[in-house]
């Protein structure tokens, strides 16, 4: 199974933050590390994670390298980014980019803690 892992799942995993999806986020990441799920991370999630972590830069680099060893970075084409900009069905542009990245890697699913904002997702 190919899955694009949304930023919030990865942040739950890294920070162990109190969230109702905390345990599920860990399970998803464990499945990726065991090779049971072919996990991807959207290219722009890396900068969001960097910005969100409240730790020294050395720690941020360590976490990003670990995540990139665990998940493959997925991009989006120029045309897909333009399509995301024009897509008025998504309220959040970043979520639309997640969906475009999932489409780019032919993901079977997009794993997120934010189900309500992905009702219009193609994946």
Question: At which residue positions do the language-model features occur?
Answer:
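Short, well-structured N-terminal submotif of metal-dependent ribonuclease cores
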Residues: 1-39, 53-59
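Anionic, Ser/Thr-rich low-complexity intrinsically disordered regions
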Residues: 37, 41, 45, 62-65, ...
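Active-site neighborhoods of divalent-metal-dependent phosphate/nucleic-acid chemistry enzymes
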Residues: 72-116
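Generic alpha-helical structural signal
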Residues: 23-26, 61, 65-68, 82
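Structured loop/turn residues at beta-strand edges in well-structured enzyme cores
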Residues: 5, 69, 105
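A short, flexible beta-alpha/helix-coil linker loop
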Residues: 10-11, 46, 81
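Residue-level signal for well-ordered alpha-helical positions
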Residues: 16-17, 52, 87, 121
């Amino acid at each position: 199974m190919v899955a694009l892992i949304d930023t919030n799942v990865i942040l739950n995993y890294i920070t162990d933050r109190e969230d109702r999806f905390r345990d599920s986020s860990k399970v998803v990441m464990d499945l990726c590390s065991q090779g049971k799920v072919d996990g991807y991370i959207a290219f722009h999630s890396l900068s969001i994670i960097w910005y969100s972590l409240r730790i020294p830069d050395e720690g941020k680099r360590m976490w990003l390298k670990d995540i990139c060893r665990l998940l493959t970075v997925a991009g989006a084409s120029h045309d897909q980014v333009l399509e995301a900009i024009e897509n008025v069905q998504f309220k959040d542009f970043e979520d639309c980019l997640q969906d475009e990245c999932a489409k780019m890697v032919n993901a079977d699913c997009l794993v997120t803690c934010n189900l309500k904002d992905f009702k219009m997702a193609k994946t």
